[in-house]
Amino acid sequence: MKKLLLGILGLGLLLAGCQEPVEPVVQKAAGPKLVSCDPTDGTQGLTGSELTVKMTFDQNIKCPSDKQALISIDGGASIGNVNAYMTDLTIKVFGLEGGGSYVLTVPAGAVQGYRPNQEGSEEVKFTFSMKKVEPYVPSDLDPVKTLVNPKASKEARNVYSFLLEQSGKKTLSGVQSSHSHKNDFIDAVYQHTGKHPALAGYDFLFLQFSPTPAGWSWVQNYNDISAPKEQWAANGLVNYMWHWNVPNSKADWDNGVNNYNFDGYNFYCDKTSFDIREALMEGTWQHDFIMKDIEEVAGYLQLLEDENIPVIWRPLHEAAGNYNLYGPNGAWFWWGRHGAEPCKQLWKLLYDQLVNVYGLDNLIWVWTVDVTAGAEDQYLDWYPGDEYVDIVGVDIYAPDTEAKTRQYQALVDMTKGKKLVTVSECGNIPDPSKCMAAGNKWSWFMVWPNADSNGNILLTPSDNNFNLNTYAYWKQVMSDPYVINREDMPSLK
């Protein structure tokens, strides 16, 4: 029996030794896992016709070209480019339309890792939608018929009514004086063309110096209003602006007050650290300073009102749009350095003080935008509001005399056509006939003074911003049938 059992055992061992070995089961490594997506899944309100989607995985990945061809998007859009680098899969999508909803699909296995015996990725579906964009419809110019100040003087109302009447028919000629209290540019244009510009511009640039001490050869005295009186008496219109000089520090202010030294004053951002935000806060020296300056300007404007002279008033110019376009300080002038909101607050403060506190009813308020490329996108953000602005203007310095349709339409669109529009400053004069032919209903143009190093007015060309204002072109413009000169103006008294 014992021998039999041993035999059976031996036979079993023999049979077992003849069987094939069993291969061990090896599990595949997990495929790459999606960690994040930019934009995030479900994002709404995207803009543009193209989109770059970046999918980030938990490991370095690859996406072979045959797998890239399987990535798809619906809704009529198309896949433009697929790129796998390190942990990121970048997909560029084209042909997106406003208001559309889309699903971008990366099929299972399209994204692969670099580990041996590894699964591909799971299917990824990325959904997003585009902002519905209403078709652009340009606004038509249909200005309101009244000034924002309900107590506006009779003369101011007369001027505004005249501008309304001429809108789309003719444009007024205008020049900026190179001095605060002289009609030097007007006289130079007249001497050459035989016609006076209808609009004369003056500037409170030298407010701190006024009045200069007796005996100075350089005289600044805003109490002398003989130039605007002469202009108004001859049926011309009067425009004032304000390059608002401010002190860099309280010490600079004190130095100006005590020693008549204004070396520490400026209006350019890169030359003063004066902070508009501090100026809007009561209790700061900056606030005390601007309130004193406003009071002083109000006194000079009152002299004009006492003579029944209406003033086209254009302060805080060129703030709109240039806060991110000029220099390391972020603005051209200090009133635009810290963005739109403080600037709008300052405009409203200035309006309240001059109209409601000092009772100036002779002002027609002009808000000026900047023409720097790309600035149009910012216009509305900076606009103080219809209740504080009568007319909107743009300062244009261009190496041509073509109609400025882009700038014109941007201004009209900003107020939905509710405000008159003007070329509030220019170098080369936009050709009035070309402007009218293009449908640009500019109320006036204001040529900036082109002067030599001694301050003498030049009608001859200088740099590219003025070089087309030749003697011949001045005569052409001042004789243009679409231009109103001072000789053509009615009495608006």
Sequence positions of predicted segments:
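Acidic, Ser/Thr/Gly/Pro-rich low-complexity segments and short DxT(G/T)-type signature motifs
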Residues: 24-43, 108-135
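Aromatic- and acid-rich polysaccharide-binding/catalytic face
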Residues: 202, 379-401, 448
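C-terminal motif of bacterial Sec signal peptides marking the signal peptidase cleavage site
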Residues: 14-17
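Short, surface-exposed alpha-helix to beta-strand junction/turn motifs within ectodomains of secreted
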Residues: 49-82, 109-112
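N-terminal module-boundary/linker segments of secreted carbohydrate-active enzymes
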Residues: 132-205, 209-218, 433-434, 488-493
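Substrate-binding cleft of extracellular glycoside hydrolase catalytic domains
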Residues: 210, 214-351, 356, 360
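Substrate-binding cleft of secreted/luminal carbohydrate-active enzymes
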Residues: 171-177, 419-493
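Aromatic-lined carbohydrate-recognition surfaces of secreted/lumenal glycan-active proteins
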Residues: 175-176, 314-316, 347-377, 419-428
